Amino acid sequence: MMANYFRSTFKFRKTTVSTLFVLTVLVISILTWFDANKYKSNLPDDKSSNSLLDAAWHDLQVITEKPHPYTSHFNDNVHDYLLQRVEQISKKSKFIEVSDDSANGVSKLFQHLDVFNDSSTETRLVYYESSNILVKVEGKSPQLPGLLLSAHFDSVPTGYGATDDGKGVVSLLALLQYYSENQPERTIVFNFNNNEEFGLLGATIFTYSEWFKLVSYVINLEGAGAGSKAALFRTSDTATALLYEKSVKDQPFGNSIYQQGFYSRFVSSETDYKIYELNGLRGWDIAFYKPRDMYHTGKDTVQHTSKAALWHMLNIAWQLSKYVVADQTTASQEILDDESNSSPAIYFDIISKWFFVVSARQLYVWNIVLLCVLPITLILLRIVCNKLGTWRMPTSALFTRIPFALFVSSFTIYFTKELLLQLNPTIWSRNFILPFLFCISEFLLINTLVLALFEYLWPIQDFKTLSLLELSAIAWLFLLKCTWDLSSSGFKATGVYPVTVFYLFISLASMFGLCSMCFGKRPNATNDYDNSEFMRPDTNDTHSIECPRQPEDSETTETSPLINTPSSSVQSSPIASSKSLPGAVQYLQRTLNYDWSAQYLLAVPINAFLIWESLFNLFDALSMTVQESNKATEAVFKFAIYGAIFLCSPLLPFTTKLNRFVVIILGVVTILAASFSLFAAPYTELAPLKLRFVQRIDISRETKQNVEIYGRAGANIQEVLSSLPSRPNVSCKDSGSGTELCVYEGMWPNFGIPMKVDVVKNTHNDKEHFEYEPYFADLRINVADNRLCLMKFNTTGKKHLKQVEFKVGNETTTHSYRTDEGIDSLLLHKLSWNVPYYDVQLKWIPQYTAEGSSDTLGVSIDCYWGEFDETIVNGQVVQKIPAYNELLQFLPETFIVSNRESGMVTIHKYLEL
């Protein structure tokens, strides 16, 4: 009885397959939710950790009281508070030394690489006055290569910087507290750096420090979102990834798909890690990455994050740094020195519990082995099945059903993508799960209907094994392409590992099906091809049909039917012939009637979970970028379509066994998800549209000012801005790539026009100037209460400017830079708010061509102010930038504002010398 119950329960039938499918979906959903929320309940329970966390949380509240960009006065307050905390922590430790760049007058003029554009040929000069706070914790073994811990304490003008990068900064304070009481083996240098947001300058200036020579490794803490979990964005190589794996046992989180985004420049932004990497350090870039709708806005506050998120970053940095500098210095150094670990790493976590690392070079070797061994094995098994006569499917069945179903379903979701692009392209920024679920359910539904129709009209012996073989062949081609990409990219295509896993498990499932077929019931010697065995679409077994038995004395006569029916004698002949087989073979035949379950478990759950987790993390990071450009939108849609196909493909061999209830549910889910995706409002209070603000004052000829708002086209920005209380006259125009620029005359800032440019001398107008003699011009840029100005040259021709000299205020030091390649721009910073001007001397050489000489130098000067808080004018408290405050107060809740440039207000002056 139990045997019959077992057979009836676990046969390859619709109820069983449907139940297993539903269980797979439920388990993956539960694991995903658990993974996304587990960190919230993972706060420390020991006293020392709680003490560090509480202190860090208090520090975070203090430094995020106001926005604090480099161009703000409150930036100095944050610097002073951090310096006071650092000195308080380190005063009792004899092995700690503190250095303040601001007090030491650290400044530098240097040519700055364009880290956002590797192909740039511009000569960009930067003069930077630093206020970094450096702390050296001397190690017990100072001869060992040291570790740098880095985070930046500046914010953007519109953000309070709780996550970007307040949590990184206070995590460093907590780690400093720990290492002040527990001297490490390696030397640690802490870099609390300033002005990361607009040029990564705090990290750059540190590379000129003597303490930079002490370190070989870096842990950079960053915030590219507004909370949740801190991900391992990227790491230098397999050795550093292995150290993360060995050290971070509590809540590891990261995926090398993110790393490939940086390698390929798909991710256009950068962090301080890039500067350290370019200067020879190896290490880890650990960052918050979501939600981007709060990133660089007024919602990047303590109120919109949590202690749990702070603890996640602090705990990871603590575990990793302890392993490297204290607990396992010898073991870690052996791993770091191992040349076999020098290639880029492929890594990923499983539900923040297990972390897996493999060398990209090693994966390349494995791919080649799999590409060679698995197809040969499958071909040999196929030949064996032919020899044994157990393969009884016509050749015409090969590469027809699955390719046709994939074509129809792919065409359908491509049409859906185009429809969604037209009607609601930015719905992903509100909720990426439902649009993606729409793609998944639609793809599955179309394939189920098409393949079920095939099976009804043209049933075959073992559709699932045939389909798995076809999928294996298709996956082989994709793996070949990925392996080529892995090699041609210098092993930097670190996001291709899901294709390897997919091909491996699909091939194993195919292999199992062929092995089962080898032990299947063979046809009667007198009837080599008994089509009736597999012509019923509702068959419950894999290779044979359970049919009513004929009486044993039944014989074939002249009146027997020409085509056997289920009650004909030939149907019983395999059963009769099987009695002559050995008992072990008969047992295998009975057991392998349930081979479908092994094939399902090999092909579906592991692939589905790994692919879903990768896609979920990818959409989590990228879904809100649809607001930024058409390119980003196209990328998200591409990931959705290819991701849905990739995710659902392992299930296709089993879709013909999904019962009508599952099919109905798929249909309902498709309709509901489609309705939401096509018609729901893309922006809400919890998922607002981000607008980018700058107020530009032009004093080139007549003084005029405009507010410029950049945002996603098609979001009724003009209508919303026109309804502001000031009733501005708004004009909008396309700014390219799916965005628009809206301009209107806003309310004037309440700090006057604190910029004036005087041309003190210009030899271009000197009548005694010789024809081939260089020109000189002396400028004085008067800027009160300012820290940042940008000069751009050659705006009327080629690179004429060859030399620049300048002084900051009345200081005696002259800074000079000369290059025959020409200078494109000069970025000037000064820490003192009381220094009223820059004196700049420019030297340029006229260009002589057949058409004549070109000797005019164009100079564009922009100075930035980054504060929008209150000020006192004529005894009254007023807003510094009322145009911005009007937006904050009166924009609908579905909009949020970020900065467009380095300051909230830009004053512009153009000269021709």
UniProtKB/Swiss-Prot annotation:
Known glycosylation sites: 117, 729, 794, 810
Positions of the record's site feature: Transition state stabilizer: 295
Residue stretches of biased makeup (Polar residues): 557-566
Cofactor section: Zn(2+)
EC number: 3.4.-.-
GO MF terms held by the record: metal ion binding; metalloexopeptidase activity
Topological domain spans for side Vacuolar: 37-364, 416-431, 487-494, 622-634, 682-913
Identification of the protein by name: Vacuolar membrane protease
Co-factor note (free text): Binds 2 Zn(2+) ions per subunit.
Record: active site: 196 (proton acceptor)
Localization annotation: Vacuole membrane
Alphabetic keyword roster: Glycoprotein, Hydrolase, Membrane, Metal-binding, Metalloprotease, Protease, Transmembrane, Transmembrane helix, Vacuole, Zinc
Basic and acidic residues bias (residue ranges): 540-552
Disulfide bond residue pairs: none
Entry binding sites for Zn(2+) 1: 152, 164, 222
Pfam families xref list: Peptidase_M28 (PF04389), PFF1_C (PF22250), PFF1_TM (PF22251)
Family: Belongs to the peptidase M28 family.
Role description: May be involved in vacuolar sorting and osmoregulation.
Positions contributing to Zn(2+) 2 binding: 164, 197, 296
Major localization listed first in the record, in broad terms: membrane
Superkingdom of origin: Eukaryota
Bias-annotated ranges (Low complexity): 567-578
GO biological process: proteolysis
